[in-house]
Curated annotation (Swiss-Prot):
Keyword Acyltransferase annotated: no
Main localization (coarse): nucleus
PROSITE patterns, alphabetized: RRM
SUPFAM superfamilies: RNA-binding domain, RBD (SSF54928)
Domain of life: Eukaryota
Entry's localization field: Nucleus
Protein name: Putative splicing factor C222.18
Role this protein plays: Has a role in pre-mRNA splicing where it is involved in spliceosome assembly.
InterPro entries, per the entry: Nucleotide-bd_a/b_plait_sf, RBD_domain_sf, RRM_dom, SRSF
SMART domains (UniProt xref): RRM (SM00360)
Alphabetic keyword roster: mRNA processing, mRNA splicing, Nucleus, RNA-binding
Length: 111
């Protein structure tokens, strides 16, 4: 069992600094297609597109690189890249702790 922190509440484990969070792609995007678009920057350990129980939810993905430097390069090069008909957004994946901390900040703005 890995000691790596869980990502967002989906429960994916990953190495911090090695994993990118991808969003803004259509329902026809497949993990294999997304992974192939990123693998030119380095070896990919995993590419996941979680399945939501809510069909209206926006799709997102996690792309994990073997080497941190390759993830940094992909983060720089793939921001606002076009894959098929989609212009994707690329951010660093957050740990579960950071996700919840940021979520609490958002909720506190409404108090």
């Amino acid at each position: 069992m890995s000691n790596a922190p869980s990502n967002t509440p989906t429960g994916f484990n990953y190495k911090p600094g090695h994993t990118l969070y991808i969003r803004n792609f259509g329902t026809d995007m497949r993990a294999r297609t997304l992974g192939q678009a990123f693998e030119k920057w380095g070896r990919i350990v995993r590419c996941d597109i979680p399945i939501s129980s809510n069909p209206q939810a926006h799709r997102y993905a996690f792309v994990e690189f073997e080497e941190r430097e390759k993830a940094e390069l992909a983060h720089e090069k793939m921001r606002n890249a076009k894959i098929g008909n989609d212009i994707i957004f690329v951010e660093w994946a957050k740990s579960r702790e950071r996700y919840h901390r940021d979520d609490k900040r958002r909720l506190s703005n409404y108090a």
